[in-house]
Amino acid sequence: MSKKLENIRNIGICAHIDAGKTTTTERILYYTGKSHKIGEVHEGGATMDWMEQEQERGITITSAATTCRWQDKQINIIDTPGHVDFTIEVERSLRVLDGAVAVFDGVAGVEPQSETVWRQADKYNVPRMCFVNKMDRMGADFYRCVDMIKDRLGAKPLVIQLPIGIEENFKGVVDLVKMQAVVWKDESLGAEYSYQEIPDDMKAKAEEYRANLLDMVVELDDKIMEKYLSGEEVTEEEIKKLIRKGTISAAFYPVLCGSAFKNKGVQPLLDAVVDYLPSPIDIATVKGVEVSTGEEKDFPISVSEPFSALAFKIMNDPFVGSLTFIRVYSGKITSGTTVINTVKNKREKIGRMLLMHANNREDVKEASAGDIVALAGLKDTTTTGDTLSDEDKKVILERMEFPEPVIELAVEPKSKVDQEKMGLALSRLAAEDPSFRTSTDQETGQTVIKGMGELHLEIIIDRMRREFKVEANIGAPQVAYRETITKACEIDYTHKKQSGGAGQFARVKIIFEPLKDVKDLKEEDKNKSFIFESKIVGGAVPKEYIPGVEKGLNNIRETGVIAGYPMIDFKATLIDGAFHDVDSSVLAFEIAAKAAFREGMPKGNPKLLEPIMKVEVITPDEYMGDVIGDLNSRRGQVQGMEPRGNAQVIKAYVPLAEMFGYVNTLRSLSQGRAQYSMVFNHYDQVPTQVADTIKAKK
């Protein structure tokens, strides 16, 4: 697979749900010769949508990576989901892409999720171009859509095509670079098209938009600008070179149009991907940390450098088992070699390497910088966001940041058989998706699943039922409360047991204090929620018994004294004690420590804590008052506001308990135009009247 880096395009196709993204990808695969029959999403037959739920719901959930060829270039396409609960997938794919095509619905224009995806692409500085789709639909308006890209996204559109005819009369586009019309023949499934004269009724408009295009691109090159201003002709080659330069530097975003469903506009879109979107060489470097020095630096993207790759997706394939998708940033890799997972410091042997075409696979022996391949048979240790690297030159590529899950549900298997299958299913699903977590509630023994939203967990449960055949009962969403103490207290407790044979004896004297009151906290202890220290001198408690005290406290603190929630943010210091030569043991000290905790904690003025979320709402100006009013009614504290593009970002701290159902409220407050994200920030005391209600429920 050795090839020139400049001939590779790693692109994503991203958009709002239903803008026609999967259909566009399908057409690309058809015209590049990878699909023999065009899959239609509304028939449930699209090649990219290969999980059962996707074919039923007609939405794309898993970003499938596909390789195809156009004009001797290799295009790796990542199809990304457009639903807000799956933004983790979008983030993850944007991280490994070099460029993107944003698909817009020609009727609806820029929709809320288009804004979210656009802002995520801004975060990773992904160069992109726009494809205004569905030009054949009733109410399609290309020019309105271009205005919305300008106003709603605050982006600079560079129109390089104009539609010929609208709605059912849409038959082609005017290419403003070549200044010719491109018209498709209906009967050839869009495979045949011809260049023609621009229709008379469009000549004036084409001239006007061509002048705008030239005004924008010549700004990027002083020589060509002089030539243009002196009235000389700017060549097609020069225009293309400048459009490429401006696209890669995000000076503007080329806008094309078409109707993927009606097979019009796809080939020029492919030409534009090749002509204007970057190759790995244009991106040049990737950020990372050199393991030996801990220094952060930019590593060159090149085949001659040592091997490094980022695992960006793990997927279960019914035929091959677990697949790890990697983007190779530097060097090359062949099957049979051993590399190191630098995040986990574990070796991995490379077995089968596959090039994926949506649902078909092709075995390859080698992958090099710029490639996106799937590895079969890696150990379970490699998870999303890990780096695989050369053992001699270890690097950790920039970690992807995954949001904390914000909603949790209890799931209970219906039978013993289901219980075993559920454990396996959940661990597999969590390996695929870092925004999904599972844990076991120590008290109730229930399994708790946590995710990014209700649809996210719904799909997880659905996959558990279908792929792993697990039947389970589902509980209502819950909040994870905690407890702590607010003042220091000292306890002297003696545990004695004498009942024939060997007895038990242990005495401990412990000081419990809130972490915030501890002076001279060591650096490594600053992020801990519980610290144990022994200040025993002179052997009052022999060394070998002290771990028993720590173990007892660690176990018992999982069940607090107010409502049974785990105790956090306190320090326990063992200052004195006593032992018996025969009757003392590690177990006796463990029991004594637990009893000291139960007796001491109520004296430390314990309080209930709740998770406080950092909430960011991005809303158009006109809904700002309503959004802030609603956040205040949820015990929220608004921290500030800042403009972003033409919207306002409201930052606030809000208790998680008040955020259930927020997505629906926000939708109705803003007619679906506002979006929000929230991440866990800190724990804070629960107000007394709220705490009383929680205690009563327990």
From Swiss-Prot:
Protein name in the entry: Elongation factor G
GO molecular function: GTP binding; GTPase activity; translation elongation factor activity
UniProt main location, coarse: cytoplasm
One Pfam family matching this protein: EFG_III
Compartments it resides in: Cytoplasm
Lineage: Bacteria, Pseudomonadati, Pseudomonadota, Alphaproteobacteria, Rickettsiales
GO biological process, alphabetically ordered: ribosome disassembly
Family statement drawn from the similarity comment of this UniProt entry: Belongs to the TRAFAC class translation factor GTPase superfamily. Classic translation factor GTPase family. EF-G/EF-2 subfamily.
Gene: fusA
Functional note: Catalyzes the GTP-dependent ribosomal translocation step during translation elongation. During this step, the ribosome changes from the pre-translocational (PRE) to the post-translocational (POST) state as the newly formed A-site-bound peptidyl-tRNA and P-site-bound deacylated tRNA move to the P and E sites, respectively. Catalyzes the coordinated movement of the two tRNA molecules, the mRNA and conformational changes in the ribosome.
PANTHER family per record: RIBOSOME-RELEASING FACTOR 2, MITOCHONDRIAL, TRANSLATION ELONGATION FACTOR G-RELATED
tr-type G domain mapped to chain residues: 6-281
The entry's keywords: Cytoplasm, Elongation factor, GTP-binding, Nucleotide-binding, Protein biosynthesis
UniProt-annotated binding residues for GTP: 15-22, 79-83, 133-136
Family annotation (SMART domains): EFG_C, EFG_IV
